[in-house]
């Protein structure tokens, strides 16, 4: 199988640039190639291998109908996280991680329900008959909920996998996933402890192009996995016997959409 991304793509996106040598986590030493002008250079041979591993893992979970949550609240990640999660038909948090998003899922669901209620009120004419001051307050509440919960509004359950950009910044999200045993796939820079991460992708987590490249690869894996899931579905015809039992008379694969 060809590599998910090429060395050229990684270099062009600046995936190899780590943090300053004085800001490093020694546990990332196995993923560092060298240092240049006070900056650690990530070993892209290892990045390629681990990105392939991450891709295959995400694809396999997608084939089983898995739910994925993309997390990246730093400015450089916000757009890519939302766009790539949406492209893959998945969910995202790209503003602030609300504590308990995973570990207190019931409470989060109640806030999502409130968001949906407010959206419905804004669309069904309810806002038109309420006092302007009340509408302003409700609109403010709706906008705030949309900002923080819009990306998980339709998430049916707790996710099967978290994909995280900068687990150092998103340490609360990673910790909640660890508590619940949810696997974490993450872009891990040279200043970060890789231990809480199940599938490490050693990479620059500060460059917009690097984030877009790797988040895009993870979305591609999900899309491919979901396609495989669709391809494997079959139509089964049954015949009812005189004794009331049923037997399969034909089974054929569904045509691709």
From Swiss-Prot:
GO terms for molecular function: structural constituent of ribosome. Residues 244-257 have a biased composition (Acidic residues). Transmembrane segments: none annotated. GO terms for cellular component: cytosolic small ribosomal subunit. GO terms for biological process: translation. Keywords: Ribonucleoprotein, Ribosomal protein. Residues 226-257 are annotated as: Disordered. It comes from the Bacteria. CDD domains: RPS2 (cd01425). The keyword Chloroplast does not apply. Pfam families: Ribosomal_S2. Belongs to the universal ribosomal protein uS2 family. This is Small ribosomal subunit protein uS2. The gene is rpsB.
């Amino acid at each position: 199988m060809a590599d998910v991304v090429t060395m050229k793509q990684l270099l062009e996106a600046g995936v190899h640039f780590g943090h300053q040598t004085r800001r490093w986590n020694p546990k990332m030493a196995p993923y560092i190639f060298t240092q240049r002008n006070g900056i650690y250079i990530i070993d892209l041979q290892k990045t390629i291998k681990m990105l392939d591993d991450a891709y295959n893992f995400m694809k396999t979970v997608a084939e089983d109908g898995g739910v994925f949550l993309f997390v990246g609240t730093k400015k450089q990640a916000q757009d890519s996280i939302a766009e790539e999660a949406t492209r893959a038909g998945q969910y995202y948090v790209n503003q602030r991680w609300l504590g308990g998003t995973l570990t207190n899922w019931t409470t989060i669901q109640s806030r999502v329900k409130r968001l949906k209620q407010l959206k419905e009120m804004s669309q069904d004419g309810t806002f038109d008959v309420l006092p302007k001051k009340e509408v302003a307050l409700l609109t403010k509440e709706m906008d705030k909920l949309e900002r923080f919960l819009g990306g998980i509004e339709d998430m049916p359950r707790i996710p099967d996998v978290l994909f995280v950009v900068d687990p150092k910044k998103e340490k609360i999200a990673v910790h909640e996933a660890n508590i619940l045993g949810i696997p974490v796939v993450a872009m891990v820079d040279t200043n970060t402890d890789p231990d809480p991460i199940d599938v490490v992708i050693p990479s620059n987590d500060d460059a917009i192009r690097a984030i877009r490249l790797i988040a895009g690869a993870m979305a591609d894996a999900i899309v491919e996995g979901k396609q495989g899931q669709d391809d494997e579905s079959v139509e089964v015809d049954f015949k009812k016997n005189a004794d009331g039992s049923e037997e399969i008379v034909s089974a054929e694969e569904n045509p691709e959409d």
